[in-house]
Amino acid sequence: MNAIANLAATPRADLGECLADLAVDALIDEAELSPKPALVDRRGNGAHADLHLGLMQASALSLWPCFKEMADAAQRHARIDARLRGVLGQLGREGEVAMLRTTEGVNSHRGAIWALGLLVAAAALAPRRTQAGEVAARAGRIALLDDPAAASGDSHGERVRRRYGVGGAREEARLGFPRAVRHGLPQLWRSRESGAGEQNARLDALLAIMSVLDDTCVLHRAGRVGLAAMQEGARAVLAAGGSASLAGRRRLRELDRRLLALNASPGGAADLLAACLFLDRLPAALGGWAGSL
């Protein structure tokens, strides 16, 4: 990739490698988490005819150079402005090309490139300040800047935004990822504190996001009916005690069947779960970097 060639020399220490590792690990852990309603996981393809777990893993790995270069660019530039936004946009597009080459044209992680790319850059800008809300707010400040080289919006997500009047991934980022920071992460921590295992805590975090997100992936596939089924079903699982309880597990199976019948896959919520996992691990991962930067 050559988009950041003019952003000066190699950063001190390899913060970029650490952040790229965290981002890729978050994507792989999200993909492998099971049983997720209507999403690719260890059981199968969910509502996706063109995706499977191996492809999701390979796609995530293909994005490591993209995330590293985003972190390096932010660390070199050291401030949020239009120039950094343009560089990150170009790197994201190059990362998307690498992803599509790996998946032979299947869009497996376009939304994740956007969300995790912003968070990686935000973390690199201030590696001593790793509190989730602060990192997400910095990412939001980057997202508020326009990318002059971005293509005109005619993606599925853009069309859904216009049709249904929802904010989508762009607004979620510009607001500082509130569904991840205010819903997903608190639920992850609550479930851990209540004694749930890590996989159940992550499932509960996903459900908390699903319960409040206007997921454009679901709206694209199943409209308002699908969105209501996702949100109400996720709330029902949590109200029944979460994915670690017998009643919650029954509700989770019902939600999975309902979303599969509607061909509604909550891909936006999955991207935000990966963002949660990244933010959750960030303080421990960067604790050793603070003294050397």
From Swiss-Prot:
The keyword Magnesium does not apply. Keywords: ATP-binding, Nucleotide-binding, Transferase. InterPro entries: CitG (IPR002736), TriPribosyl-deP-CoA_syn (IPR017555). It catalyses: 3'-dephospho-CoA + ATP = 2'-(5''-triphospho-alpha-D-ribosyl)-3'-dephospho-CoA + adenine. It holds the Pfam family CitG. GO terms for molecular function: ATP binding; triphosphoribosyl-dephospho-CoA synthase activity. It comes from the Bacteria. Its EC number is 2.4.2.52. Disulfide bonds: none annotated. Transmembrane segments: none annotated. GO terms for biological process: prosthetic group biosynthetic process. NCBIfam families: malonate_mdcB (TIGR03132), PRK01237.1 (NF002315). Belongs to the CitG/MdcB family. Involved in the formation of 2-(5''-phosphoribosyl)-3'-dephosphocoenzyme-A, the prosthetic group of the acyl-carrier protein of the malonate decarboxylase. This is Probable 2-(5''-triphosphoribosyl)-3'-dephosphocoenzyme-A synthase. The lineage of its organism: Bacteria, Pseudomonadati, Pseudomonadota, Gammaproteobacteria, Pseudomonadales. The gene is mdcB.
